[in-house]
Amino acid sequence: DPETGVTVFTAFGETSRFTDEMLDAFDVLVFDLQDVGARFYTYLYSLGYAMEACNRAGKSMVVLDRLNPIGGLKTGGTVLNPAFKSFVGDYELPTQYGLTIGEAARYIRDYQKLTLDLTVIPLEGWERGMYLDDTDLPWVAPSPNCATLNAALCYIGTCVFEGTNLSEGRGTTLPFEVIGAPFINGAVLEKKMNGLGLPGVHFRRTSFCPTFSKHQGVLCHGVQMHVLDRETYD
């Protein structure tokens, strides 16, 4: 870091697992990241891998708890099959798991049977039914493609399309809020999606042209997802 002179390591990609050099750089690890509340968002596994490394090396860890921006009352979606573990799925949690990052740390400690010295600094003023915009906290994008709270709400339902040949909206101004492809008929998809009667959500036909990622530079057709009622949305 140019201001402090502190060495900065990247705990992602090839170094998502802490190296010995990284572990030798500290005695206590402070974890302070804003998660989005979805099982396949990578910060959950950055947390877990850090905990495993500290457990192995005998290091202490402090987690600064942060609210779950999409609320702490609802859970939903499928539970991970352990046969498909990866960096975007390593714990048997539902898609929307309803925990704060501090609660997730305690869950991971118990799930992985870790014995590390873990301290969670608790939240203040948050109630489980609160979404981020029920607080006075600003939305600070936890990653470039999760730019709004609505994107986080849509993400729990649309991120699955990353594993298909459909665009999940990366390379547009509405990542995870739009899905589509050059070969999709937006009007037909709109009718079929709304015909499912899914609670709390409406689908509107749209077209978009990703500037990067899947179908870069190609006009795609599909739907935009509008969450109308968070309480019934599932």
Model-derived features with residue positions:
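A short helix->loop->beta-strand "cap" motif at the edges of active sites that frequently abuts
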Residues: 54-60
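Glycine-rich oxoanion-binding loops at beta->alpha junctions
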Residues: 2-25, 38
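Conserved functional hotspot residues or short segments at active or partner-binding sites
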Residues: 180-234
